[in-house]
């Protein structure tokens, strides 16, 4: 195989691997590239390699996605194979049969591969939005912020980090594993989200602060219930963060006002210390929402600067989405 062709195959396999483990929508997979390669070769080795990178991946075997998702993926893979090959590939049908026989769970897993060779795995409800909260969903801006953090570890090394609206915990878990913070505080207002957050922290080999058996080389990890509208200075003063982060929390005008308010109170808690650095990442869905955010910041005397887009694309998320991140000075 020519070097260029080999590189193309590796990229294709990586595309399937990262999307499948992260349980991305099937339409986001590089199916056209796969079909083109299958037409150029009568060999089924590529399909076997895809199985090894997806349903047979060690991370997937340990932390599988929902049975329904795996079944839909394999069905689509079989369709692509049958469209260009007359001979069936027994291995595909064997794996599909195994999947159909597996017991479905109310929890599925999404895994994200890290540049260190490790991974972050989230155990999540198989429902897209559960119990009236979107906090159980991993939004694309959380992936974008995690990528930026991994590329800029100096912002977090040996520092106390407070995350507002942690949701499923992807960003914080990636920072804890890759950026060596001294302490990390996950926060969210919803009790069901907090319950799942605690589970995800433990699932990824981290210990919560009350666990005296925890790894001393790991950051001190806390999961805190924090409602921006009711949190007073005395509660916030316990956190004393050096860095505050948030991802995809600008979903309505009320949330923007609440966010700016809690940031102001966090700054007031630092007394004679320097105010925390703040990074807010979001998907630009509505320019008016972004404008409202910067207007509210200006009204409260908070300066902001847009962070340059980072280079690495480590996690799979919408390729055509516009992402932004602001660095705020309180």
Curated annotation (Swiss-Prot):
Family annotation (InterPro entries): FAM86_N, Methyltransf_16, SAM-dependent_MTases_sf
GO BP annotation list: methylation
Alphabetical list of Gene3D superfamilies matching this protein: Vaccinia Virus protein VP39 (3.40.50.150)
Residues annotated for S-adenosyl-L-methionine binding in this entry: 139, 165-167, 228, 247
One family name in Pfam for this protein: FAM86
Domain of life according to the entry: Eukaryota
Cellular component GO terms, alphabetical: protein-containing complex
Keywords: Methyltransferase, S-adenosyl-L-methionine, Transferase
The keyword Methyltransferase is annotated on this UniProt entry: yes
Enzyme class: transferase
Enzyme Commission no: 2.1.1.-
Record-level Gene Ontology MF annotations: methyltransferase activity; protein-lysine N-methyltransferase activity
Cross-referenced PANTHER family: HEPATOCELLULAR CARCINOMA-ASSOCIATED ANTIGEN, PROTEIN-LYSINE N-METHYLTRANSFERASE EEF2KMT-RELATED
Record family assignment: Belongs to the class I-like SAM-binding methyltransferase superfamily. EEF2KMT family.
Protein name: Putative protein N-methyltransferase FAM86B1
